[in-house]
Amino acid sequence: MLMQNQVTKRAVGEDTMDLKLHHINLSTNNVAGMSHFYRDILGLKTETQDLPVLEKNKGYDGDVTFVSDGQIQTHLAEKDVNVGFRTGHIVNPLERGHIANRTDDLAAFKAHLKKKGVAFSDWDETAVAGWQQIFFYDPDGNVIEVHQITS
């Protein structure tokens, strides 16, 4: 089993880059209740490492709690159906939540998506300082994030 900080190179189509599951974001109108459930019922621990620095003055200032099983983070974020409108992005990762992968080469991953004809919304560092983020949809409309650490 891979630990969170271990990364394996894997082929993404014809391309190769580091890409690993980083977190799952669940959007909620009850962050405190969700935090209680995930900590007290599922036994997840409050996460204190490798956390995003939220840019609360750039369009999203909701409450977020971070928990983890020691490998994968779960971000419990206050639902915000209008954050896409306020920030000028077509994909809203805080309406229904999303799953997030981390890469070491976001430019290569964006080129890969373009080559495959997958449209994406480039948030750059709009929401998180030091994280360049893109968001796109899978075939069923689930939101996927891929980000790269920049600092």
Task: Show which residues each predicted segment covers.
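Vicinal oxygen chelate
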Residues: 2-17, 20-30, 62-68, 86-151
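Short secondary-structure boundary/capping segments
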Residues: 16, 56-57, 65-66, 90-91, ...
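Core segments of cupin and vicinal oxygen chelate
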Residues: 25-73
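A short, acidic/glycine-rich surface segment
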Residues: 51-56, 82-87, 122
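Short, charged/polar surface micro-motifs in flexible loops or helix N-caps
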Residues: 70-74, 81-83, 106
